[in-house]
């Protein structure tokens, strides 16, 4: 899984698990179709919807120079009813 960096476990993402929606951070250059293909191929599930947004990088000061970390994209993936990604649920508990 080259494009998916890691799963996100926040209050909102845990609440979305009840609606069969999974949240993860992906590479900023990945497209929605690539992520959908990777999820369907790797986990063997059917994706019906995807929402994505870009999160800005944080500012880092190095002496007088202001730099920043890389921005990344967060995807909220909705699966068809009856499908689930068990490895992500087990990792949280």
Swiss-Prot record:
Source organism: Liriodendron tulipifera (Tuliptree)
Protein name: Large ribosomal subunit protein uL23cz/uL23cy
Role description: Binds to 23S rRNA.
Gene3D superfamilies (UniProt xref): 3.30.70.330
Entry annotated with the keyword Chloroplast: yes
A GO MF label: rRNA binding
Gene that produces this protein: rpl23-A
Keyword entries, A-Z: Chloroplast, Plastid, Ribonucleoprotein, Ribosomal protein, RNA-binding, rRNA-binding
Origin superkingdom: Eukaryota
InterPro entries: Nucleotide-bd_a/b_plait_sf, Ribosomal_uL23-like, Ribosomal_uL23/eL15/eS24_sf, Ribosomal_uL23_CS
């Amino acid at each position: 899984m080259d494009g998916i960096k890691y799963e996100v476990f926040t209050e909102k993402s845990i609440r979305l698990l009840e609606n069969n929606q999974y949240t993860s951070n992906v590479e900023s250059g990945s497209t929605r179709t690539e992520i959908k293909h990777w999820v369907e191929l790797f986990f063997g599930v059917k994706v019906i919807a995807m929402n994505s947004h870009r999160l800005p990088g944080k500012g880092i000061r190095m002496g007088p120079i202001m730099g920043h970390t890389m921005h990344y994209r967060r995807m909220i993936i909705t699966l068809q009813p009856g499908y689930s990604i068990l490895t992500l649920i087990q990792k949280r508990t």
